[in-house]
Amino acid sequence: MSVLAEQYKEEIVPKLMDKFDYENIMAVPRVEKVVVNVGMGELKEDPKLIDVVVNDIASITGQKPVITRAKKSVANFKIREGMPIGAKVTLRGETMYEFLYKLVNVTLPRIRDFRGVSPKSFDGRGNYNIGIREHIVFPEIEIDKVDKVYGLEITIVTSAETDEEAYELLKLMGMPFNQ
C-alpha cells in the first residue's frame, strides 16, 4: 500500500470525522480518481507528436493514455471529426495514490516561482483542477530529449459533497494551497 493511502486510512479519516461530524466512516470524503489530460491543437500539423505525448504521459502516470479525438468538424479550428487532438489517462486505486504523492511532494515544488496552488479551483461539487504549463516539471521527463513543451490538466475527483470538505481532504493529503 502506498504511503498516501496508509496516511489517508490512519490519520486523515479520523481528522475529517472529527471536523465534519460524520457518523459513518463511509461518509468521509475520499479521492475517487485522478484524470490527467493533454489537449494539443498542434497535433493537426504534426501527427508524429501524438506518439511523443502518449509516451510522455505514460511515463508520468505509469499507465497508457487514451488518444482523444475530435467529436465534430470545426472549420475555424481546422479540425475534422475523428482527428487526434489530445490524450488522457484516468488513474484509480494504488497508481492514483502514488501519482498524487509524487505530484504533491516532487512535481509541484519543481515549478518555477511556485507559491502554492489556488484554493479557488474547486468546481462546486468537491472536485479540484490543476493546470500545469510545462510538462517538464515531472521528474520522469528528460529535458534533453524534449522537442516541444506542452501543458496538461490534472483533475482530482473526490466523493466530497462540498468544496470545503474536498479542500480539507486535499490539505490533509499535503496539497500546498496558497493563502
Curated annotation (Swiss-Prot):
The keyword Ribonucleoprotein applies. InterPro entries: Ribosomal_uL5, Ribosomal_uL5_bac-type, Ribosomal_uL5_C, Ribosomal_uL5_CS, Ribosomal_uL5_dom_sf, Ribosomal_uL5_N. PROSITE patterns: RIBOSOMAL_L5. One of its GO terms (biological process) is translation. Disulfide bonds: none annotated. One of its GO terms (molecular function) is rRNA binding. Keywords: Ribonucleoprotein, Ribosomal protein, RNA-binding, rRNA-binding, tRNA-binding. HAMAP family: Ribosomal_uL5_B (MF_01333_B). NCBIfam families: PRK00010.1. This is one of the proteins that bind and probably mediate the attachment of the 5S RNA into the large ribosomal subunit, where it forms part of the central protuberance. In the 70S ribosome it contacts protein S13 of the 30S subunit (bridge B1b), connecting the 2 subunits; this bridge is implicated in subunit movement. Contacts the P site tRNA; the 5S rRNA and some of its associated proteins might help stabilize positioning of ribosome-bound tRNAs. This is Large ribosomal subunit protein uL5. It comes from Halothermothrix orenii (strain H 168 / OCM 544 / DSM 9562).
